[in-house]
From Swiss-Prot:
Record flagged with keyword Transferase: yes
Residues binding (6S)-5,6,7,8-tetrahydrofolate, per UniProt: L121, G125, H126, L127, S355, P356, F357
Site (Plays an important role in substrate specificity): H229
EC assignment: 2.1.2.1
Pathway: One-carbon metabolism; tetrahydrofolate interconversion; Amino-acid biosynthesis; glycine biosynthesis; glycine from L-serine: step 1/1
PANTHER family found in the cross-reference section: SERINE HYDROXYMETHYLTRANSFERASE, SERINE HYDROXYMETHYLTRANSFERASE 1
Species: Streptococcus mutans serotype c (strain ATCC 700610 / UA159)
Catalysed conversion reaction: (6R)-5,10-methylene-5,6,7,8-tetrahydrofolate + glycine + H2O = (6S)-5,6,7,8-tetrahydrofolate + L-serine
InterPro entries cross-referenced by the UniProt entry: PyrdxlP-dep_Trfase (IPR015424), PyrdxlP-dep_Trfase_major (IPR015421), PyrdxlP-dep_Trfase_small (IPR015422), Ser_HO-MeTrfase (IPR001085), Ser_HO-MeTrfase-like (IPR049943), Ser_HO-MeTrfase_PLP_BS (IPR019798), SHMT-like_dom (IPR039429)
Gene3D superfamilies named among the record's database cross-references: Aspartate Aminotransferase, domain 1 (3.90.1150.10), Type I PLP-dependent aspartate aminotransferase-like (Major domain) (3.40.640.10)
Gene this chain is encoded by: glyA
Name assigned to this protein: Serine hydroxymethyltransferase
Single biological process term from Gene Ontology: tetrahydrofolate interconversion
PROSITE patterns associated with the record: SHMT
Length: 420
């Protein structure tokens, strides 16, 4: 019978070969995409567990199906651990993604057509913070706030002035490409002054918040959302947190039955394991190393005149580099670096002049290489390899040298062994 096939290497060679090739790619490439990380084998194993068979619409103790005793145990563990990790009174661990977590938060806080302020996409915001191609920009009246054109960091006085002018119902704080500490208290003060609610999307910095290395938004935000991958180093999924009982009820209703049906309990199990890992003191050490590695790379780029680090610094796990003085655009840089086995993404920079398909910049994050074991010395080396590559795009001999140096690094810090 088909379901007796447990060796997919033999049963479905095409899928096996693609997955095996991806395993090799991850082992042999230096991963600098800021939204990616490396999960533990325990987290990976939970995602392939028997829980994938179980349907469980509803919430622990209030399911629409029978046979949910054990998934209730798993989901309750995930909820309690998430609450402990972030100091929240209420947590919903069911969102399939950060985008769905954000959609649920919007449904709980505002109505279609309401005015919302979110960070401009080119300044480091996210598609779900009001982009016209996203449900957020199509459902709500989003008005973008920006960074200061001189410093390229948030100017809270300017944000307050803009909020007083547009009178939003909601202000969204958080980013996908902003390299500095976000002052959530100031955002809450601004929201209170104009009678708005505050939502924080901490998807990128949640691991740093959990480790106490970035201010926690929970005391200030009406609702906080996050993904569970990125700096939390967990499975791909979402999480919604609040300290408000009424909002917690609205969030639960928004997620089920509003946006989703049955939760992915095998992913919820992986989230529970992730939160236990995050609560371990070793995780704080890891998170501190992420920041140290990021700052080590920034130092290298700041020492090279043709590479401009946006805002000149980083206080978290990522930073942007304007590469237009060395190559045509960010897409060109991304493709050339991919060819030498360094993986990152093109990215818009504040007040971007190029299209999102080309961009002036690249985004670099250190969560994945830190999980792999890289320290400041290795990260400085990687930064130098990026400079070397982009300054010698037509020199195949130099590019081959970079490939060999990348191999020395990836061989010295193996990722996984014999997973497939």
């Amino acid at each position: 019978m088909i379901f007796d096939k447990d060796n997919y290497e033999e049963y479905d060679r095409e899928v096996w070969e693609a997955i095996h090739a991806e395993e090799k790619r991850q082992q042999n490439n230096i991963e600098l995409i800021a939204s990616e990380n490396v999960v533990s084998k325990a987290v990976m194993k939970a995602q392939g567990s028997i829980l994938t068979n179980k349907y469980a619409e509803g919430y622990p103790g209030r399911r629409y199906y029978g046979g949910t005793d054990y998934v209730d145990v798993v989901e309750s563990l995930a909820i309690e651990r998430a609450k402990k990790l972030f100091g929240a009174k209420y947590a919903n661990v069911q969102p399939h993604s950060g985008s769905q977590a954000n959609a649920a938060a919007y449904m709980a806080l505002i109505k279609p057509g309401d005015t919302v302020m979110g960070l401009d996409l080119a300044a480091g915001g996210h598609l779900t913070h009001g982009s016209p191609v996203s449900f957020s920009g199509q459902t709500y009246n989003f008005i973008a706030y920006n960074v200061d054109p001189e410093t390229e960091v948030l100017n809270y006085e300017q944000i307050l002035k803009q909020a007083e002018e547009v009178q939003p119902k909601l202000i969204v704080a958080g980013a996908s490409a902003y390299s500095h500490i976000i002052d959530f208290k100031k955002f809450r003060d601004i929201a209170d002054q104009v009678g708005a609610k505050l939502m924080v999307d901490m998807a990128h910095i949640a691991g740093l918040v959990a480790a106490g290395l970035h201010p926690n938004p929970l005391p200030y935000a009406h609702i906080t959302t996050t993904t569970t991958h990125k700096t939390l180093r967990g499975p791909r999924g979402g999480l919604v947190l609040t300290n408000d009982e009424d909002l917690a009820k609205k969030i639960n209703s928004a997620i089920f039955p509003g946006l989703q049906g049955g939760p992915l309990e095998h992913i919820v199990a992986a989230k529970a394991i992730t939160f236990k890992e995050n609560l371990d003191p070793a995780f704080k050490v890891y998170a501190q190393k992420i920041i140290e590695n990021c700052q080590a790379m920034v130092e290298v780029f700041n020492a090279h005149e043709k590479f401009r680090v946006v805002s000149g610094a980083s206080e978290n796990h990522l930073f942007l580099v304007d590469v237009t003085q060395v190559v045509e655009n960010g897409k060109v840089a991304q493709n050339i670096l991919d060819d030498v086995h360094i993986t990152l993404n093109k990215n818009s920079i504040p007040f971007e002049k190029l299209s999102p398909f080309k961009t002036s910049g690249i985004r670099i994050g250190t969560a994945a290489v830190t999980a792999r074991g890289f320290g400041p010395e290795e990260c400085r080396k990687v930064a130098e390899l990026i400079v070397k590559t982009l300054e010698n795009t037509e020199n195949e001999a130099v590019l081959e040298e970079v490939r060999q140096e990348v191999k020395l690094l990836t061989d010295a810090f193996p990722l996984y062994e014999n997973l497939v």
